[in-house]
Amino acid sequence: MEAVLTEELDEEEQLLRRHRKEKKELQAKIQGMKNAVPKNDKKRRKQLTEDVAKLEKEMEQKHREELEQLKLTTKENKIDSVAVNISNLVLENQPPRISKAQKRREKKAALEKEREERIAEAEIENLTGARHMESEKLAQILAARQLEIKQIPSDGHCMYKAIEDQLKEKDCALTVVALRSQTAEYMQSHVEDFLPFLTNPNTGDMYTPEEFQKYCEDIVNTAAWGGQLELRALSHILQTPIEIIQADSPPIIVGEEYSKKPLILVYMRHAYGLGEHYNSVTRLVNIVTENCS
């Protein structure tokens, strides 16, 4: 009986993992579809919204049917196994027992599904909402400088990846890992320049030395999001100014004391419906084409 239950949990976990993978792949596909449709093409944008909703509905139905089929098959296998070993046991009117582990997995899967649905809803809403307006403003600001946004993945490393991308244009090959490590080292060796600006979110008090040390360790060892302090450290490390372009505020330049050509990042408050995000920039495609013709 224990072997049957273990196999049941293994099969369900594998199915739920595949479902999560398929959902992530669908979100990536949807993002690609959105990027392929011009922002000012309202007719195609409307059709895109309908297509996205259809794709998500079809996947949700497919996953529900697969999960129901697995549970049905598992139930039948369990009954067959018990019948072989305990021939005199009457199974009628005895509902299948659900283990605590299975309940936890189902609850976790339900929460994950709810989260992904909220993200998908935010994505669709932002086609005409704050994200769309922010993107339009940034596109105009950058176009005036013959630039456009270069998308960077939203994975916690976006600021460092945007810096990495900008450095490639200068033939400087520093990876995200190296940038994070050097940032933490610089901040640890210049504590007085950074500690006063960090406060405990629960108490409002300035970080203790131990909390500051943990903050620096997280820069190296986790996907901790980088902000103004990390940009300040990077400008000193690279001895290069860093310009941050925003939709509703003037550009911010960190490291103005340096004379090199600045690295340019785009700061977005409403990216992906998930909060703040950094992107890189590149030259406008049509400008590059004209120069090469």
Swiss-Prot record:
Coiled coil: none annotated. Its EC number is 3.4.19.12. Residues 147-284 form the OTU domain. The active site is at residues 155, 158, 277. Residues 267-277 are annotated as: His-loop. It is linked to Intellectual developmental disorder with dysmorphic facies, seizures, and distal limb anomalies: An autosomal recessive severe multisystem disorder characterized by poor overall growth, developmental delay, early-onset seizures, intellectual disability, and dysmorphic features. Additional features include microcephaly, absent speech, hypotonia, feeding difficulties, structural brain abnormalities, congenital malformations including congenital heart disease, and musculoskeletal features. This is Deubiquitinase OTUD6B. It comes from Homo sapiens.
